[in-house]
């Protein structure tokens, strides 16, 4: 047979049936495709790629790597685990992501990209390659549950005016920096992250695991409507606005449109769906207190996501907005700093997850001149302190996220250190490891990675960090990446300065 690869899941074939799901592959001209995404299909795709003109591929790769090496896009993996040889981390203290204590008298055995055992010292296999951690602490790779891959490293004006190709290249560069900050997984909650996810997973670009939501689904004049007033009204024959065409947002009004936009993101490979259910601090058109999407519209998104085994998360701050989300079946509240205590109790009673960002009145706060935005920012900062208190008081499931936009990605680790102002350092780390990993399991079968994340336990994916710093005493070491002595993702070392 003759094959020519176009992209993941799409290839030409003389006659087609997916040999994994055993379903006929529909024909559009010469293009046959299957979306089963099974390991067998992906393995076949890798073999197909290997059969493509190796000389052309190697020549092209050399040119591309040479062109972008200085830009940060060349893979920065230090060394993969040698085939079939286990790796044993020794002489360490362990924070496993769930237990709020450090453990001594344990080693970490890694095989096939996973943690295969936690043997006592001296009990690991003799053939294992040993890495002496020098008495340092080993923690799970960090997880940011509220990240925007495409928007984290560029200014707002660049995001809204530059060619989307430039934004993707900048996102690739930022992905490498994100991994070097110790964040081995991010939940992307809005933006065209599918291409970067594929590049990272295939080893083209170094970066974290990405759980993509795809385009933010927003009502007209909602928090994800990035049009200008001079583009209104839009007529049916008008081309899509820039943000929609680029995959930043998808506008939907009414149940049928919400269903369609949700299903489009699922078709692209979304692991969860993101909607906007309220306004923002500095939004130009949607007030902070505004309610967005009716309950019926929200439920349409929830139904479509549930039919695919996944869930909806929602940008929302106010009690009224959060309550509407919960009634509609939304599983994860993003922000929520203006919730009253009754609403927090409602979240706890319904098992709703809460992704809380440390929006505080400090050096990382956005600088506003508009009095309304300044006042709204003050309310959110005060609400952030209550959110941490009430979330723990009422035993809400919650996890750490940053929501860094338009530059400032270097503050990602520093943002996590702020949680130690409100709880013990290990409790704060738990929210960016074990708890965050549990939130990611809501994606069910749409999760792009098979295995537990955020924990150091038998069978978990081998994403971990070796740190210089006392994790029981504080988290200030997170602000300096030099304190991350080893960064491992899937058993592969992307940094080793031990």
Regions found by a protein language model. Name each.
Residues 1-53, 67, 71:
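N-terminal secretory signal peptides
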Residues 18-21, 34, 220, 275-386, ...:
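Active-site core of metal-dependent hydrolases
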Residues 51-56, 65-85:
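N-terminal twin-arginine translocation
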Residues 73, 77-79, 85-87, 94, ...:
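Histidine-rich, glycine-flanked metal-binding segment
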Residues 92, 445-447, 452-498:
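C-terminal cap of metal-dependent C-N hydrolases
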């Amino acid at each position: 047979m003759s094959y020519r690869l176009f992209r993941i899941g799409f290839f030409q074939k003389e006659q087609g049936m997916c040999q994994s799901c055993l379903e006929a592959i529909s024909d559009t001209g010469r293009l046959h495709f299957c979306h089963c995404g099974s390991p067998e299909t992906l393995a076949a795709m890798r073999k197909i790629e290997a059969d493509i003109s190796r000389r052309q591929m190697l020549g092209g790769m050399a040119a591309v790597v040479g062109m972008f090496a200085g830009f940060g896009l060349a893979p920065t993996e230090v060394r993969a685990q040698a085939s079939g040889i286990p790796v044993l981390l020794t002489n360490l203290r362990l924070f496993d992501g769930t237990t709020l204590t450090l453990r001594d008298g344990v080693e970490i055995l890694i095989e096939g990209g996973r943690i295969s055992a936690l043997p006592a010292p001296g009990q690991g296999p003799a053939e294992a390659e040993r890495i002496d951690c020098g008495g340092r602490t080993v923690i799970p790779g960090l997880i940011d549950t509220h990240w925007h891959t495409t928007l984290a490293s560029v200014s707002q004006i660049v995001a809204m005016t530059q060619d989307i190709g430039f934004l993707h290249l900048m996102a690739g560069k930022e992905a490498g920096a994100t991994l070097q900050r110790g964040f081995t997984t991010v939940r992307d909650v809005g933006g065209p992250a599918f291409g970067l996810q594929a590049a990272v997973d295939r080893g083209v670009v170094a970066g974290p695991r990405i759980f993509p939501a795809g385009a933010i689904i927003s009502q007209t004049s909602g928090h994800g409507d990035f049009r200008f007033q001079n583009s209104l009204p839009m007529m049916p024959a008008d081309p899509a606005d820039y943000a929609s065409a680029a995959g930043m947002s998808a506008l939907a009004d009414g149940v049928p449109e919400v269903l369609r936009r949700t299903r489009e993101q699922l078709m692209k490979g979304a692991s969860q769906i993101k909607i906007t259910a309220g306004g923002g601090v500095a939004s130009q058109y949607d007030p902070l207190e505004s309610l967005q999407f009716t309950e019926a519209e929200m439920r349409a998104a929830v139904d479509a996501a549930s039919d695919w085994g996944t869930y909806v998360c929602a940008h929302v701050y106010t009690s009224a907005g959060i309550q509407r989300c919960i009634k509609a079946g939304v599983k994860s509240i993003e922000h929520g700093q203006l919730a009253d205590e009754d609403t927090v109790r409602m979240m706890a009673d319904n098992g709703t997850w809460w992704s809380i960002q440390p929006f505080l009145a400090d050096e990382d706060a956005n600088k506003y001149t508009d009095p309304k935005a300044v006042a709204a920012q003050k309310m959110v900062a005060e609400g952030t302190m209550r959110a941490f208190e009430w979330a723990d008081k009422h035993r809400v499931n919650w996890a750490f996220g940053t929501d860094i936009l338009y530059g400032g990605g270097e503050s990602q680790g520093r943002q996590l250190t702020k949680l130690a102002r409100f709880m013990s350092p290990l409790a704060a780390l738990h929210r960016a490891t074990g708890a965050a990993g549990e939130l990611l399991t809501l994606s069910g079968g749409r999760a792009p990675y098979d295995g537990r994340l955020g924990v150091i336990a038998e069978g978990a994916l081998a994403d971990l960090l070796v740190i210089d710093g006392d994790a029981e005493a504080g988290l200030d070491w997170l602000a300096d990446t030099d304190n991350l002595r080893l960064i491992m993702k899937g058993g592969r070392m992307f940094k080793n300065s031990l």
